[in-house]
Amino acid sequence: MGRPELGALRPLALLLLLLLQLQHLSAADPLPGGQGPVKECEEDQFRCRNERCIPLVWRCDEDNDCSDNSDEDDCPKRTCADSDFTCDNGHCIPERWKCDGEEECPDGSDESKATCSSEECPAEKLSCGPTSHKCVPASWRCDGEKDCEGGADEAGCPTLCAPHEFQCSNRSCLASVFVCDGDDDCGDGSDERGCSDPACPPREFRCGGGGTCIPERWVCDRQFDCEDRSDEAAELCGRAGQGTTATPAACAPTAQFTCRSGECIHLGWRCDGDRDCKDKSDEADCSPGPCRENEFQCGDGTCVLAIKRCNQERDCPDGSDEAGCLQESTCEGPRRFQCKSGECVDGGKVCDDQRDCRDWSDEPQKVCGLNECLHNNGGCSHICTDLKIGFECTCPAGFQLLDQKTCGDIDECQDPDACSQICVNYKGYFKCECHPGYEMDTLTKNCKAVAGKSPSLIFTNRHEVRRIDLVKRDYSRLIPMLKNVVALDVEVATNRIYWCDLSYRKIYSAHMDKASIPDEQVVLIDEQLHSPEGLAVDWVHKHIYWTDSGNKTISVATTDGRRRCTLFSRELSEPRAIAVDPLRGFMYWSDWGFQAKIEKAGLNGADRQTLVSDNIEWPNGITLDLLSQRLYWVDSKLHQLSSIDFNGGNRKMLIFSTDFLSHPFGVAVFEDKVFWTDLENEAIFSANRLNGLEIAILAENLNNPHDIVIFHELKQPKAADACDLSAQPNGGCEYLCLPAPQISSHSPKYTCACPDTMWLGPDMKRCYRAPQSTSTTTLASAMTRTVPATTRAPGTTIHDPTYQNHSTETPSQTAAAPHSVNVPRAPSTSPSTPSPATSNHSQHYGNEGSQMGSTVTAAVIGVIVPIVVIALLCMSGYLIWRNWKRKNTKSMNFDNPVYRKTTEEEEEDELHIGRTAQIGHVYPAAISNYDRPLWAEPCLGETRDLEDPAPALKELFVLPGEPRSQLHQLPKNPLSELPVVKCKRVALSLEDDGLP
């Protein structure tokens, strides 16, 4: 058989090439419509059979995430752990989630009747009844909140008050001392009904109009204690014609406005449309003026923020902010359709074979009637919904669209207020849990305390401190007969309370059970206090911190008041509230000065930084939620209650209200409630701290309620004192051992500090007297803090008898030491920390195990020896130079014949010719205010000698910036006062040496 011809094979070859090309095109475009190449998934994704990509962690989780169940193929059978509950469909959930009121099993078997009916409540819990199968802590019984669905935990609760209490008409209990005291403490007036005006006890004075009784020592003390100011009446105090004799605190006339009620506010708040004074005197006699640039003027002349214009809320009293607003037409929603030509038609008119849009865009022939979801679910990862025109991808609850087709999990825990305390994110949902000591209320989903006694709310009411039991609703007086108490705090472990009295300018402490007894009230701090308005207790390290708006300082002391020092005295204008976090070593404070702000620093004064400086006007009270790590504050000017995290981020305005936040002052947080005092409303309010809702009044008709705290052991968690963990007592510190901020794992645990009149030594542990400068007063003042000097603090040893107590106010009264030692000060470790003049505590972080081998003798020798060596070297150099100058200097005396003929009795100059490379002598520069320069004038006659040239020398070498003494006046030429050598009277005859 012969070979086929080449021409006969060509058709076969072309056919083969055509088949190969078709196969290639089919492989490149496997899906109809040409949807592109095969989709590749990321490394952390799983590729389904239908080419979808899902997170790899969704593989074998018993959920059909691929929609074709390919992610659950060939998966091993799961076995739940002993600590888990096995759902009927095989899912595993934590055992604590069983019968908690929420269905975590996909089939709901964890909350089924068969599962929960067999459960019995433990002894420490209360059953909500046979039908609910729910258990609640026994401490929640009769706490005023319904925790069971049917309210079984609040059923049958006794309503009778204790024998020493008064039951109000609203069924609340009140201490008998509040009955017939002139204040409506019940809230319904039942405690003041049928009351006569009883006489005041001995040594007390009744205010006018049947008012309250005050101690007689408060009468005519130049401070208003009665609401009607009758205790300072001119006729009573014997100062007729002078009006009231009380003198309110002086306000800065150039920067502040004095309210008639005595407060000081910023001068710019006068006539700004907002009532800032308690008596509203800052808005009295104000002419209507234009609003600010960021404000809108209402029809009645009032001003509101411009952003509130046309917000569909009535902000102006006359509603003019919503007048004339154009409502934008939207074409959104399933029942509306946006035409390409711009019209908006009803969704039911789409694909009805009738033209409703001008461009026929509602009747596309190729799309109407086409169901895209039938092919590959429209490309949607979860839910595909067919529309009349096109389709839409949606996601189940807990998921969100990432790229219009793929669903991804929503991390609900990104919201800091998603849960009461702990938020755990899961695929498609999240779970809330509670910290130890708390338990979830399945009805409200809030964490409630189960450990410790019932929480109490303690607040100052100017003349007394009161307490409200938040569970039993008992209302009692804790400390009576106080002068003007503003700030307070508590130490739960020792059951002590601390408070500041502005009138007496003292800080007190007392045991809670004996605080009403004057003899049990201990004075902790009574010196160098002006206006202590903020107070905080470090319950771990046993310290108290306070702000002083008069001295512009923040200070710290031990809880017994024996050791104290000033941490900050710079860049403070009006410091007010202060709060501490001993667990992390930080403190926080508010400053309502001209540049209002909230700041943060370490408990040792290091790492100072500003957290809030914008959109803040009058920050008063601040408080910390240590569990959620958030800071809450109230702004009396903006009428807001806001919060941030401990680093200043995630800012959130919780409440804005001119009614409930008219003039807030103090704020406190516990569980899911936030509490605050209001001076204008004279009441205490509470609200939900997560959403700002559920606003309620706890107490009203008060007299200047200021600070407020919560007394409960969970508010002050126990922790180890770093200073006690050291091998040496008090961390090796001679005076104060202060905790350092825990910024990282390498942060030191503590640093040492000294009293204001002493400095930290080279070993960073011992304290020394500040060396007295002998040069000028200005130099000494620049190196010391600005607070007045005090006597030696108790417990401090003076190691060098030559050191003197240093005072920046009267430095000339203390004799300088013969050999003063300049102890080097520790530099600041943070750029945000004030200059060294603001603090005398250590900023160097030594190891805890370092030895105290460095002594005062070593420190003195280490400073004096180099000075002596330098002085000897300088003296030796001077003697060598003087000897060399004498050897290299020759003198020549000669007579001028011409001059001799005329004036033979004139003195001749003595010329010194030196063999030096320099011509003449350079005089030191002198600081002078004279117009003409100072020159060394030649000797032209007799000159007088100065007995003591020191005064003139001192005036010539005054340091820059130092004031000149007025006792010694400079002459016209200061150099003429320097000691000079008299010109010698000589008579020389020149012999003829052959000169021409």
Curated annotation (Swiss-Prot):
Keyword DNA-binding carried by entry: no
LDL-receptor class A domain sequence ranges: 40-76, 79-117, 120-158, 160-196, 199-238, 250-287, 290-326, 330-369
Tissue-specific expression: Expressed in neurons throughout the brain, with strong expression in pyramidal neurons of the hippocampus, granule cells of the dentate gyrus, cortical neurons and Purkinje cells of the cerebellum. Also expressed in the epithelium of the choroid plexus and of the blood vessels (apical expression), as well as in the epididymis.
Keywords attached to this entry: Calcium, Cell membrane, Disulfide bond, EGF-like domain, Endocytosis, Glycoprotein, Membrane, Metal-binding, Phosphoprotein, Receptor, Repeat, Secreted, Signal, Transmembrane, Transmembrane helix, Ubl conjugation
Region (Disordered): 778-851
Membrane spanning stretches: 859-881
Predominant localisation class: membrane
Protein residues bound to Ca(2+): 58, 61, 63, 65, 71-72
Leader sequence segment: 1-28
Subcellular localization, as worded in the UniProt entry: Cell membrane; Secreted
Biased composition (Low complexity): 824-839
UniProt-annotated stretches for the region Clustered O-linked oligosaccharides: 773-831
Reported function: Cell surface receptor for Reelin (RELN) and apolipoprotein E (apoE)-containing ligands. LRP8 participates in transmitting the extracellular Reelin signal to intracellular signaling processes, by binding to DAB1 on its cytoplasmic tail. Reelin acts via both the VLDL receptor (VLDLR) and LRP8 to regulate DAB1 tyrosine phosphorylation and microtubule function in neurons. LRP8 has higher affinity for Reelin than VLDLR. LRP8 is thus a key component of the Reelin pathway which governs neuronal layering of the forebrain during embryonic brain development.
Domain notes: The cytoplasmic domain is involved in the binding of DAB1 and in the recruitment of JNK-interacting proteins. Isoforms, which lack part of the cytoplasmic domain, are unable to recruit members of the family of JNK interacting proteins (JIP) to the cytoplasmic tail.
Family, per entry: Belongs to the LDLR family.
Protein name per the record: Low-density lipoprotein receptor-related protein 8
UniProt source species: Mus musculus (Mouse)
Lineage: Eukaryota, Metazoa, Chordata, Craniata, Vertebrata
Underlying gene: Lrp8
